[in-house]
Amino acid sequence: MRRILIILLCAIFALSLAACQPDKTPAAQPTPIPSDPSIQPGNDEDAPLHTFYGLSVPGQVEYLYSDDGILLFEYAYQHIQMQIADQNVSDKITLDFLSRVDSTRANADSIAQQARESYDGSTTWSAYKYHIYYSPTRVDQGVISLFGTRTTYTGGTHPDQGALSVTYDAATGEYLTLGGILNHVDNKEDVCELVLDKLEDLDYQYSLFDGYENIVKDRFNADESTDEAFYFTNSGLCFYFAPYELAPFSTGIITVEIPYSDLPGILNDAYFPDEYQPATGKLIAQSADSADTNKFAQLMELVLQPEGEEVILYSDKSVRNIKITSGSWTPDGLYFLPDYVIFSATGVSNEKAIILRMSIPDIHPDLMVSYETVDGVQNYYFLKNNETGAIALLSVE
């Protein structure tokens, strides 16, 4: 099978948000799950993957240095790469996403100039930063949805942080607004009430400002634009509020998820996720060089890190909702701190496989893969034996 690989000149840059810390995943004694190249193709009647979509968001970082070699400014952003059923739709989404990324360059150039003018040679200088990172939150036949963070640092005690999102109709490639996903514009009021109900439950935890209800109602006013204030996940429709919007900065970004079970009659039927039979397989990782790719009826190829090697992911039966998250370890090596999701796919089976170009270390894994089976969400680290070249998935327990 002829494989087509798009190489992007990019490198994944780890980003940790101080005001919106990810959950800490305790380190575990890794249990190697060896690759099994003997798996033979068959039919995936176990839990057929009718939709075989994938999306990666490889990152790139640009640096600006002073004449004396001091880092003045760094600008981090992403490309997007996807494989879905309709190439024209894929191209349309890609062009829109990249245009949004390109529109941030003017801000980056402005901050870079501020850094040039502010640098005085002091040993206490801290580099200015402008980081924009998206994570795919739902990728399927209904929608392509991503949620991101924007971090700006120009000196001071902490960076300024904001949230952003983009959602596309997976059938047409159209950028979706809130009004475009609801059955009727009046449904904004219904959604507003659902969000307020959720926030009421969170008030004790977040110490929301007095009168926050009015801020939320203004957000959902039918005459106001809320195009970029929502995104989809596999479990619901999410709405978010930036630091200072509803609560003190230390609270970080506040996210409210409305489960799909609360949205019949409100959300357009086209944007509900399909129901599917739970998968019962296990994920298998193997060097693509040692795999017989011809045994797969469908093969998807995407890039995470262009300097890496090709790794093939497939299953003995099938698994669903694969996500790969970049991260780093605490200095004591006890906790893995996830940064952001860099890859998402509907799943793999013994007929459908994914080849990813990625870097896999032999120690201190920095990529975690998760997927869904009938037993729930499974989490593993990627690890490589540099002596044999074998790739293993190490269980996170």
Language model features: what each stretch is:
Residues 2-10:
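Sec-dependent signal peptide recognition
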Residues 15-19:
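C-terminal motif of bacterial Sec signal peptides marking the signal peptidase cleavage site
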Residues 21-293, 343:
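Compositionally biased intrinsically disordered regions enriched in Thr/Gly
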Residues 142, 162-164, 235, 307-309, ...:
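Envelope-exposed proteins and targeting segments
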Residues 148-152, 172, 180-182, 241-243, ...:
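A mature extracytoplasmic/lumenal domain signature
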Residues 285-333:
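Short, surface-exposed binding/anchoring microloops in extracellular/periplasmic proteins
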Residues 293-302, 378-397:
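Extracellular beta-sheet/turn segments enriched in Thr/Pro/Gly and aliphatic residues
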Residues 337-379:
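Short, solvent-exposed, Trp/other aromatic-anchored flexible loops in extracytoplasmic proteins
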